[in-house]
Every structure is written in structure tokens, then in C-alpha cells.
Amino acid sequence: VPSSFRTTITDAQLRG
């Protein structure tokens, strides 16, 4: 899994 993809998911969760 590309780190960029995981970063996008994490960012979305943090933003809520």
C-alpha cells in the first residue's frame, strides 16, 4: 500500500 494512500486516509480521519 503506497504511503501516500495511507496518508490520505489518516488525514481524512484526523479532519473528521
Swiss-Prot record:
Keyword Hydrolase: yes
Protein name per UniProt: Herinase
Its EC number(s): 3.4.-.-
pH dependence, entry free text: Optimum pH is 7.0. Active at pH 4.0 to pH 9.0. Stable from pH 5.5 to pH 7.0.
Annotated thermal dependence: Optimum temperature for activity is 30 degrees Celsius. Stable below 40 degrees Celsius. Above 45 degrees Celsius the activity is sharply reduced.
UniProt KW keywords: Hydrolase, Metal-binding, Metalloprotease, Protease
Further information: On the 2D-gel the determined MW is: 51 kDa.
Top-level taxon in the UniProt lineage: Eukaryota
One of the GO BP terms on file: proteolysis
Isomerase found in the keyword field: no
Required co-factors: Ca(2+); Mg(2+); Mn(2+)
Role description: Metalloprotease which hydrolyzes the alpha and gamma chains of fibrinogen. No activity against fibrinogen beta chains. Active against the synthetic tissue plasminogen activator substrate H-D-Ile-Pro-Arg-PNA and the synthetic plasmin substrate H-D-Val-Leu-Lys-pNA.
Top-rank EC class of the record's enzyme: hydrolase
Chain segments annotated as transmembrane: none
A molecular function (GO) term: metallopeptidase activity
